Amino acid sequence: MIILKLAGGIIGFVFGVVLCNLIWEDTESEHSISSKKINLYYLISGIFMGCAFLCASHNFEAGHCIDSMFMLGGLIFLAAFAIQDILQLAVYAFLLNVGVIGMLLLRCTVFMFDGEFTKMFSFLIISGTVYVGLKIIAKVFPKFMGAGDYDILFLVFLLCGIEGTYQVLFASSLAGLLICIPLLLSKRIQKGEKIPLAPFFCLGTLAYLWM
């Protein structure tokens, strides 16, 4: 089913570029970015969204149809967060809330479709506990976790579970080191400069789900 993966990747790439363009048009007056840099952002956005669709297509090919739809929904939101964070160094609270609520509703729909109401209630209780815990950490340690970071981490938890989230954090940290250290050494970014975190969470999640 190479055609399915190829089609998914192409559709995702185009969707990512279009989404990047929409976000850029919304923020163009607030940020000054060279045409060369914005073209690079278009490419990165297309790759992020293309990989999201490709990963879901890979899971669909393995026969996990319903899980693939849930995975695709979560990865689309994560890729959208990454694209906006790259362009604006922030993710809209509205987009974060839509992502979290949408994924919760989608997961509950899957449980109801399978008639697993007990699992659904357990899932809601555990998810609520994790969300509150992340929000408390963000309040107590604002330098450790930003206001929107806990929403993104919660979305990662919904996609990957608790153990998977640990692995995603490790993979994200590794990706951050591999990308940021060369940029620091070449002085393309300065020490202490704010960097977007959502792209690294997206990379870590894609790596975990693909494996």
Spans of features found by a protein language model:
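A membrane-topology feature that recognizes alpha-helical transmembrane segments
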Residues: 1-211
